[in-house]
Amino acid sequence: MADRLLDRAWPGDVVVEDLSYNPIAVMQRLEDEPPERRFTRAVVVAAVERGNRPPGAVTAYRWDGVLPNDEEIQRAVAEAVTGVIALDNTLVVTRHFGGLPDEVVIIEVEPGVQEFGDDFSEPVAKVIDQVCDLVVTMATDAGAVARLPSAGLGGALPIATGNRFG
């Protein structure tokens, strides 16, 4: 996904990066930005199996930033230390330790098959270009971001299924 996004033209204040690694390292990466270049918005894209959406469904929302209880935060940190790489875990850890900007846009795609590799499942392949367009819009258009629903982890209802946005 990051490779496809890197092929696009971006304004100078947008950074495209693959952050699919340890949540503690992601937090440290975000904190590495000098104060004058700290991010004001993060747009995070991930394939996440929620089980309540058809494969290829796209969900976009502004994360409300609400963290789970202390026990769940501790579990997320422990999982991060042991190498768990998952969207919710990364968001909880990076928010808890103050690495995320206030404005976080989440774009989730329900995978057809969730496994490591360079190829997308057929349902995801059908929507990947539209997902890339959505990422560009969310990274560059504050008005479009403002129109997204605000939601907790797991987000709102899908905005697209199959090969078209609804």
Report residues per predicted region.
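N-terminal catalytic or cofactor-binding beta/alpha core of small enzyme domains
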Residues: 1-99, 106-109, 118-129, 138-166
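Short "lid" loop at the C-terminus of a central beta-strand within the Rossmann-like core
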Residues: 112
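Glycine-rich phosphate/diphosphate-binding loops and the adjacent beta-loop-alpha structural elements
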Residues: 115
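Hydrophobic "lid"/C-terminal helical patch
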Residues: 135
